[in-house]
Swiss-Prot record:
Biased composition (Gly residues): 50-66
This protein's name: Glycine/glutamate-rich protein sgp1
Keyword tags: Secreted, Signal
Lineage, uppermost ranks: Eukaryota, Metazoa, Ecdysozoa, Arthropoda, Hexapoda
Biased composition (Basic and acidic residues): 22-45
Species of provenance: Glossina morsitans morsitans (Savannah tsetse fly)
Length: 106
């Protein structure tokens, strides 16, 4: 049972990493459709203050809100942060935010 859980988690991580793309890459479907966009054109509009309040409403730059893989990665990060043994002992070792006064190494 323990090994099957490890196998499933490993498989899920491999699939997630293989589906992940760097932020600069476009989707393969966009390339196949012939949509030729200049890179940085939308960002230049927002930097220049043009296009009357353009906020990047296409969902691509909305912090991953429309990206299901980003949601999965955020969930995995929250779980690993919750069970991280170093965070559990943070108050004991003196890494807390109480003015730098910790119990052991503060």
């Amino acid at each position: 049972m323990k090994y099957s859980l490890i196998f499933i988690l490993t498989l899920a991580c491999l699939i997630a990493s293989s589906l992940a793309r760097p932020e600069g890459e476009e989707k393969p479907a966009d390339d196949a459709a012939g949509d030729k966009k200049e890179e940085g054109a939308e960002g230049d509009k927002t930097a220049a203050g043009g296009d009357e309040g353009f906020t990047g409403g296409d969902g691509k730059n909305a912090g991953g809100a429309g990206n299901p893989m980003k949601v999965v990665q955020d969930i995995i990060k929250k779980i690993t942060d919750a069970v991280n043994p170093l965070r559990m002992t943070e108050g004991f070792l003196g890494g807390g935010g109480s003015g730098g006064s910790g119990a052991l190494f503060g």
